[in-house]
């Protein structure tokens, strides 16, 4: 991360950056409380016009300069061999909001002479690998996302033909960044919230390494609120913050949402072997 242009506190040696780096090394349940304070500090001290190259945004990471090759191949196959190729290609183009042309070229682009960003290609690949095509998304009226990073996924999904209302549940310090970004992009049907009770039962809930990183009590609140959501796309690591997510999802979550009456599919992600292994879990009617 030493080549990131904008360090929290102005340099790698600043107290803000060191606090963040220490939290990353520890990898315990205090990581997010630390990152909330750092992200809030950066929001008020660093230029929003270049937030995609803040060191804090990269630390999480909300933004990627490189992504696993299988995601790249998934994207390339989709643009060449499916009827939605042009939509997919357009959806991953960097809008140059939150970064400059130089930032894109030096840090964010996936290919030379192309504005496809690595981050957006990875988000699209989650949808592709789990079967969420423009045809499927365009028939939905409400989507909930649990933790949206900087907010790239809703912009991609709208570009794929979704026209409904998109709810994002996230931490306040992350929501303020998403809200700024989505305002600049011109979105008017994205609802940002920090409280579970404001979420509706939806056609789809997306949660990539978010729901399964929540405290168990908060997960229970979420399931009580939107457990009847029709479809789920969850990406998770088996072990995180001392919790066995495989056991939780199998023995608790799937029972709570009455998944026995729905199609449950696990899709291994073998190129992400850390934390006990990584998978997608999809639930459909």
Residues covered by each model-derived region:
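Conserved SAM-binding loop of SAM-dependent methyltransferases across substrates and taxa
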Residues: 150-162
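A short, conserved alpha-helix within the catalytic core of class I
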Residues: 214-226
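A short SAM/SAH-binding and catalytic strip from SAM-dependent methyltransferases
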Residues: 205-217
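Conserved beta-strand signature within the Rossmann-like core of class I S-adenosyl-L-methionine
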Residues: 229-242
């Amino acid at each position: 991360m030493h080549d990131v242009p904008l360090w929290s506190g102005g340099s790698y040696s600043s107290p803000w950056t060191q606090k963040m780096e220490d939290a990353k090394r520890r990898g315990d349940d205090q990581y997010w409380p630390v990152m909330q304070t750092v992200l809030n500090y950066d929001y008020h001290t660093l230029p929003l016009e270049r937030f995609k190259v803040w060191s804090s945004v990269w630390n999480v990471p909300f933004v990627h300069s490189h992504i696993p090759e299988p995601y790249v191949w998934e994207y390339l196959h989709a643009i060449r061999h499916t009827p939605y190729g042009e939509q997919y290609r357009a959806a991953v183009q960097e809008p140059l909001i939150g970064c400059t042309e130089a930032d894109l070229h030096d840090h964010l682009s996936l290919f030379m002479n192309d504005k496809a960003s690595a981050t957006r290609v990875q988000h699209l690949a989650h949808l592709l690998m789990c079967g969420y095509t423009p045809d499927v998304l365009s028939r939905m009226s409400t989507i909930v996302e649990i933790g949206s990073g900087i907010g790239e996924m809703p912009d991609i999904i709208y570009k794929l033909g979704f026209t409904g209302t998109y709810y994002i549940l996230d931490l306040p310090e992350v929501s303020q960044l998403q809200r700024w970004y989505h305002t600049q992009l011109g979105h008017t049907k994205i609802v940002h919230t920090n409280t579970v009770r404001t979420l509706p039962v939806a056609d789809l809930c997306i949660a990539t390494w978010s729901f399964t990183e929540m405290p168990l009590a908060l997960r229970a609140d979420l399931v009580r609120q939107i457990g009847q959501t029709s479809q789920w796309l969850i990406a998770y690591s088996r072990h995180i913050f001392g919790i066995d997510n495989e056991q939780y999802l199998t023995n608790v979550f799937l029972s709570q949402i009455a998944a026995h009456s729905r199609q449950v599919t696990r899709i291994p992600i073998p190129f992400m072997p850390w934390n006990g292994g990584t998978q997608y879990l999809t639930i459909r009617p």
